């Protein structure tokens, strides 16, 4: 159509030709605008688009005082104000992620939602019922070096259970069957939409957000007992503290350039950067999705830097009364106390 219009203009007088070309240019410009509008509309419809960088989306699950029901909300960047979104959306995080709401819609609800002081709520784990928690071992160069191991050429995946999850200030149980409980601060990735046979180039499109995690481990059960299988050593109740919020990916410019650290009773134990990851997040998602369908709300733990207790000289393990602080740049801090197994 456009080639015919332009061709006919060439045979017009100079003045008419100028006006006709202006009209064609205007029509092309309008088409470009309409196309852009359609593209924007489509992106807003897609799973939690990053169209507005000013949106402060730190998603939480919480309880109000004197109310044991789980509620959905967002917390301010400084951690002082909670906005309750429970009247507008599902009250559990997995269902909310599955609902595929646009961030612009969420922002409108945040603007009008009930505001609460942090002191008036209890933060829960930001997600407590993922279908899967998939972890990776030996994924930091320093963690390989402290074990005198060559960095792997293939990822070593294993799993934890939803029953491992506790909140950002909940206790870690020192189970009676182990005396070798160890710390492992990790970056957790929360999946935003179903991922199956995903190419590495598009894998980050399937991420919803990030949070701080602790892959608490019973080393005796991980390494010696249970035939050397990880299931019990990694899967005991309370062995996966998460929090304090799921920070939407729009607020994380580069998840592979975040400082990550852990302390016990105020003493630094781990200090590293996610830039040390051997298998990056996109690689993990792509590899897993070739055989395991990742679902909205699934949690991927990306490994831990050097400094775990088992590989210290002499080895160090957590004891009742210890307080473990785990922190990642821009994502926040979780603080968990070790308590006796009653």
Labelled PLM ranges:
Residues 184, 191-193, 198-213, 219:
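RNA pseudouridine synthases
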Residues 48, 123-125, 145-148, 172-181, ...:
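A generic local secondary-structure boundary/capping motif
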Residues 51, 107, 114-116, 122, ...:
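Catalytic-pocket segment enriched in acidic/His residues
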Residues 131-134, 154-156, 170-172, 179-187, ...:
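Generic beta-strand structural signal
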Residues 151-168, 181-183, 319-330:
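Structural signature of FAD isoalloxazine-binding scaffolds in flavoprotein oxidoreductases
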Residues 156-174, 195-196, 238-247, 305-309:
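Short catalytic-site patches enriched in acidic/histidine residues
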Residues 2-4, 11-16, 27, 31, ...:
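N-terminal non-catalytic cap/leader segment that marks the start of a structured domain
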């Amino acid at each position: 159509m456009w080639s015919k219009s332009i061709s006919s203009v060439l045979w017009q007088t100079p003045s008419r030709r100028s006006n006709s070309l202006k009209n064609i240019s205007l029509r092309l410009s309008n088409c470009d605008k309409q196309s852009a509008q359609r593209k924007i509309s489509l992106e807003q419809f897609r799973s939690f688009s990053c169209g507005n960088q000013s949106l402060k989306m730190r998603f939480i699950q919480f309880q109000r005082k004197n109310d044991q029901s789980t509620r959905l909300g967002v917390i301010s960047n400084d951690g002082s104000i909670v906005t309750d979104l429970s009247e507008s959306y599902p009250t559990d995080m997995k269902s909310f992620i599955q609902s595929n709401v646009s961030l612009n819609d969420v922002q409108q609800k945040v603007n009008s939602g009930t505001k609460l002081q942090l002191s008036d709520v209890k933060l829960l784990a930001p997600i407590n019922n993922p279908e899967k928690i998939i972890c990776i071992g030996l994924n930091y160069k320093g963690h390989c070096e402290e074990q005198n191991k060559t960095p792997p050429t293939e990822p070593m995946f294993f799993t934890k259970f939803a029953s491992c999850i506790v909140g950002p200030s909940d206790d870690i149980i020192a189970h009676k069957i182990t005396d070798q409980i160890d710390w492992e601060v990790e970056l957790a990735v929360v999946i935003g939409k179903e991922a199956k046979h995903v190419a590495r180039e598009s894998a980050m499109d399937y991420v919803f957000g990030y949070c701080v995690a602790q892959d608490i481990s019973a080393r005796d059960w991980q390494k010696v007992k249970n035939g050397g299988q990880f299931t019990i050593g990694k899967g005991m109740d309370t062995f996966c503290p998460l929090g304090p919020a799921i920070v939407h990916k729009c607020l994380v410019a580069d998840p592979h350039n975040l400082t990550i650290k852990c302390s016990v009773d105020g003493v630094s134990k781990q200090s590293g950067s996610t830039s040390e990851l051997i298998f990056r997040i996109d690689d993990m998602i792509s590899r897993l999705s070739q055989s395991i369908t990742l679902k909205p709300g699934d949690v991927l733990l990306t490994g831990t830097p050097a400094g775990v207790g088992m590989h210290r000289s002499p080895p160090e393990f957590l004891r009742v009364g210890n307080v473990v602080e785990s922190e990642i740049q821009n994502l926040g801090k979780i603080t968990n106390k070790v308590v006796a197994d009653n």
